Amino acid sequence: MNTPARASLPVIKRLPKYYRYLCSLQADGINSISSRELAAQMGTTASQVRQDFNCIGDVKGRQGSGYSVENLLSILEGLLFGNGDRLPTILIGCGRLGKAVSRFITTDTNGYRLIAAFDVAQSEVGKEISGIQIRHIDELESFCAEHHPKVAVLCVPRDGAEQVSGRLVDLGIEGFWNFSHYDLSVPYPDVVVENVHLGDSLMSLGYRLRNQD
C-alpha cells in the first residue's frame, strides 16, 4: 500500500473533501459510488479521482458498481485521523479564537488530543479552556519536556507566532496549525505547517457576489 507521504500536496488537500462527501453518502444509506459521480461532486475528472485513490492505497472499484463507500471511508479515516493514535496537541493563545478552536479540537473526532493550553497574559492563567487549565507560556519548556506534544495550534498575533514557533520546534513540535493571519514558514523540512486564513473564503465570496455577470 502506498503511504500518505507519497501523495502530492494537491491530492492530500482533496482527501478531506472526499471524506466529507463519503460521510454524507453513508448517512444516506448509499453503499457504492462511481469515479464519475465522485468527480462531479469534487469538480474534477473521473481520471483524477482514480489517480488520487491510487496514491492513497489499495483502492479498487468494481465494474458496474464503482467504489465501496465503507472501504473508502475506512482508508481515509486511517490516513486522516490515524488508527486510534490521537496526536498530543497544545494550544498557544487562549483568546476568543483560541477558545473556539479548542472547542473544535476537543469535541470533534479528528485524530488530535488537546493536552495543554498556554497564554502570555497572567490574567488568563489558571482559567479553564475546554476543560484544560491555562498555563503561562513560561511553562512551555518544562511541560514539553515531560509530555512530548507533537502538534501546536497557534492562535496568536504574527509577532507572537514568529517568536514561539522556533521554541516549539526545538521542543520537538512536528506540526503547526497556524491561525496567526500570516503564512508561517519554518526552515525545517520535517516540520509540517498548515496555515489557516479564515477570511480567505469570505473574500472569495465577496468577489464572486460583486463580480457576477
Give residue ranges: language-model regions.
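Hydrophobic, well-ordered beta-alpha structural blocks that scaffold small-molecule cofactor pockets
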Residues: 3-12, 16-171, 179-181, 188-213
